[in-house]
């Protein structure tokens, strides 16, 4: 039966048109890594298109949409589109957006870790905003024969504005499918031992290559998480507590105290109060207080992006130096580090239990 022969009224139905279903014993399994998203190009037009989608999400901006859309379209997009495009252009890689490049490397690095009794575990990625969209990739996975999908957000700490909205988009796509795959979700892994180990290894390896801060002389390690409005904490979002939990476990793994290590929150947007202390003012204060060296690491970002490369590496660095600091280090995110790839495989394996697939670790892939 050709889709061309289907009556037009059938194409306007609520559910997506699908080919006839055939019984299969394969039960192919897919692991879908989900990240926030990125513009397709470092141009004002592409950035405005991306920001319009991102900032129109009611889980991201929780104010009445009629009021917000007027502000967004008349003030924010015209002003921020061009300014943000310049920032993206400064960090753009030859292969494309840093977030997309590092996410693709994560996918390609994780694939060798999965094997299953004659079946292959499909590993792919999608973005909540921009391309490739969650809906498009779920449709591709279905066409590839995936009957079971594990949604694995690249957000270690749960938040309504990140994890929940990614699940919203996935379930909305499923809601348009007549023949839905079975789906599981990973809510968070803020305290997962493999994730904490990967963070600690990333810091240790950076220090092995660039020298360890002189903590006895007052140097500091700053753990900077993405901020959210403080009212979300008051409304019951667990994000703040999970960030603090991750930070405490990482400090313990590194053998550091709260005197040597600070926890801050970055990327504040708008005039409302967000989670504090804020990253940039904290670094400026540290510089003014005579701290010679500050290392900044972003545990909540699993891949480097505009917020880590430009905001931390340039803007926050300048605040520290202008405050009087002498030596600033931005420790790269987990990206495709061997310890993080092994952790992704372990987290996925735990959440695939009970499905007809066995997850095997390939030693050569994590050595």
UniProtKB/Swiss-Prot annotation:
Residues reported in the UniProt entry to bind Fe cation: 226, 307
EC number: 4.98.1.1
Gene Ontology terms: biological process: heme biosynthetic process
Domain of life: Bacteria
Pathway: Porphyrin-containing compound metabolism; protoheme biosynthesis; protoheme from protoporphyrin-IX: step 1/1
UniProt xrefs under Gene3D superfamilies: 3.40.50.1400
SUPFAM superfamilies hit by this protein: Chelatase
Keywords: Cytoplasm, Heme biosynthesis, Iron, Lyase, Metal-binding, Porphyrin biosynthesis
Keyword GTP-binding in annotation: no
Gene Ontology CC: one annotated term: cytoplasm
Top EC class for this record: lyase
Keyword Metal-binding: yes
Localization, UniProt: Cytoplasm
Catalytic activity: heme b + 2 H(+) = protoporphyrin IX + Fe(2+)
Primary location: cytoplasm
InterPro entries referenced in this protein's UniProt entry, alphabetically: Ferrochelatase, Ferrochelatase_AS, Ferrochelatase_C, Ferrochelatase_N
Described purpose of this protein according to its UniProt entry: Catalyzes the ferrous insertion into protoporphyrin IX.
Family from the record: Belongs to the ferrochelatase family.
HAMAP family: Ferrochelatase
Identification of the protein by name: Ferrochelatase
Biological source species: Burkholderia mallei (strain ATCC 23344)
Recorded name of the encoding gene: hemH
